Amino acid sequence: MAGPKRAAILMLALGEQYGGKIWSMLDDDEVRQLSLEMSTLGTVEVDTVEDMLLEFVSRMSASGALMGNFDATERLLQQYLPPERVNGIMDEIRGPAGRNMWEKLSNVQEEVLANYLKNEYPQTIAVVLSKLKPEHAARVLGIFPEDLALDVVNRMLKMEAVQKEVIESVEKTLRTEFMSNLSQTRRRDAHEVMAEIFNNFDRQTETRFITSLEEDNRESAERIKALMFTFDDLVKLDSGSAQTLMRNVDKDKLGVALKSANEDVRNFFFGNMSSRAAKMLQDDMAAMGPVRLRDVDEAQALLVNLAKDLAAKGEIMLTKNRADDELVY
């Protein structure tokens, strides 16, 4: 078993009372590496722990096992580190894989990264791309509009050694403005939590609860509706994200999901397929005959949840149902 994983098990076994002084002596890179290991441990069987650290068996849970996950890691860090430092660490370990910011960016899907960078200054884009793996930088450049891509290329060609302070400033901005949103770690209020719950209701249950809530508390009902991400909101995906989503979903499920969809939603999905694939899907849908509303709701919920999972991994970008209010997962 590798050293970092052994250290993660040790820190979990030490717990809050005995691990505090050790945490305070670690630098940021060590804390990030150790936190990442802790957050991905899952269940550590008692035999493994006993073989490594017999003296810590008495401090383990009643089941004789340790459970390492994001929440347990965050709670432990909060005991010993300032909130801002904990938030930064958790943002990074919940985000794309990589030992540092630049490795993480190289693991973010190029369309997602390009959509973010194209709103930055060309000089900033040049600095960022100069730090990425060449093959990833090339794919990002290929997505930019031609005039922007050419501007960035010229700036990269003329770029001299970038001061450490500039790199650190860019890295800080990426961490706070991009990675923190990408990893979806910001604190959510009760309306956001409830919107997620409503997203998982079937259509009839959702309508019933929303209607009742509107009668009791219209303001809260409107806030929840504004925060919900629904099947119809998938039409706001960019073409690359839509195609990524469809590559990851069973075509039969997509056909069922589109059975009760409005014309705009259907045209959006058909428009992001080849003509042949769209015709085949339309034929399959026609051959299905009547489909239970419950099955349609389940298929649509599957697509929405899949989209959220892909967005959390940095493979696609989602937007909320209000056109002027973008949300990056």
Curated annotation (Swiss-Prot):
The gene coding this protein: fliG
SUPFAM superfamilies: FliG
InterPro entries for this protein: Flg_Motor_Flig, Flg_Motor_Flig_C, FliG_a-hlx, FliG_M, FliG_N
Gene Ontology annotations for the cellular component aspect, listed alphabetically: bacterial-type flagellum basal body; plasma membrane
Family of this protein: Belongs to the FliG family.
Compartments, as annotated in UniProt: Cell inner membrane; Bacterial flagellum basal body
Coiled-coil residue windows: none
Species, as recorded: Bradyrhizobium diazoefficiens (strain JCM 10833 / BCRC 13528 / IAM 13628 / NBRC 14792 / USDA 110)
Designated name of the protein: Flagellar motor switch protein FliG
Topology within the bilayer: Peripheral membrane protein
